[in-house]
Amino acid sequence: ESPACNPYSTEDLANGGNGYLPITLQYRPYTAKKAREVSIAGGDFRENFTNRSYLGKTNTAYNEADLDNILECRRAMGDKPVIVCATVNNPMVMHEFEAEADAIIAEFGVSRAAVLDVVFGDYNPTGRLPIQMPKDMDAVEEQSEDRALDMETYIDSEGHNYDYGYGMNYEGVLPAWKK
């Protein structure tokens, strides 16, 4: 499953902070070094501040063990192929595990039977990414969240760009999607 986290900390609030933490799209701990110093997204009537910045704060995905499972699988499988099937609920930083996988299947809520049809060669995939996969968390912080398709996207070890509309089938990369 794509990384998931809690973007709010009552402990941070109790210690004088504003309670807000960065939303991480990676499994390992992420410290927001490029976040805005001032974020005027405040406005909740229960808050006595208007700056929701999380600059310098750290957050970790609560499913960080998913990455450990991939890395352990790679060690256990040795030279045998490793296929990572990621249930994608939001964009994710792929560089943490892409080099350890021989194939990555990104599924967005389809049945397990449909995924297995692709894995076992019973169905030639035709899907494309409906989102951009960020190069890293810096790319996430630098994008304009209200502007589509402006993120620096991940390019894997074989040169595939995980941009909106990217997809592969058994023959190779699907024809380019026209923006």
Region spans (language model):
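C-terminal non-catalytic regions of proteins with extracellular/luminal or membrane-system context
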Residues: 1-179
